[in-house]
Amino acid sequence: MVCLVVLSAVACSANPVDDTPPTIAPAGPAVSPQVTTAPAGQVRPFPSKAKEAVFDAATASLVVLGADGVTIMPAGDGAPRNVAVPSPPSALTGDGSGAVYLSTRGGYFRLDVRTGQVATMKVAGHEGTDFTAIARRSDGRLVLGSADGAVYTLSSDTAVAASVKIFARVDALVTQGNTAVVLDRGQTSVTTIDPDGSGAQHALRAGEGATTLAADSAGRLLVADTRGGSLLVFGTDPLMMRQSYPVRDAPYGLVGTRTLAWVSLTATNVVVGYDLATGIPVEKVRYPTVRQPDVLAFDDATNTLYVASSSGDGIQVINDAGPR
């Protein structure tokens, strides 16, 4: 049985103003060994260290956030374009229709993938806030998370409608519909936020050391418990753990698709596709990857899997990814 915790109980502490959420040392990917098997598919040069990536369906482009900035990489053989931004982004999300949003200190950037133009959006009253995560709800509203553990739901491009501050740090945000979901690595927890953004709905412990979070089109949440060696699958209405499956070799990178959940194994430079439809993950396919395969993205229209190296070893493109 999985215990459900309502985060409003946090407010019942004797001194809530001074309370700091208890934390553990955050987990992270394994330091990958040198590649000994040729990566599947094609490897495109990308000397920067990839941090996050998203595929934009409208422009058929992969947008990669690297240690040195932002790169737009068209599908096929199109030349990549580097995009200049005024300050270092921390995370990104997209709408699938040609816009990508990148969190940064004091606000976020809106990138037009077609033109490469960048607009800077300053969140009112939060010029000094270190925003660490960003997601977009189905109603178009953006949600931002911060290094000091707050979640901000915007009512316009720059205005905050509501906020809640109960986390050690907001390490990742995703959405299912108008529900935002927070991953806090220090608390190794996942938490759903009320649609109005003013409070938490439910929270669950996520293994022994959760590191990454993804959402899929079937309404599921995928979590890599890297320290515990597991793939965790949650439902969101209400938040409930549906599946927990052992995955060895430091699972880290995640992307959910219509048919498979893809997980990268950073200790062995492998990516594995799991079918979740039966109620327990079933491995369907695995591919050798580039070194340090920390970042995954997927093009559903062409079944193309992208594996981006965070050690500067390129971006791997696997066409028609999946079981044969």
Please report, for each region that a protein language model flagged, where it lies by residue.
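Sec-dependent N-terminal signal peptides
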Residues: M1-V5
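Predominantly soluble domains enriched in secretory-pathway, periplasmic, or organellar proteins
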Residues: S8, C12-R324
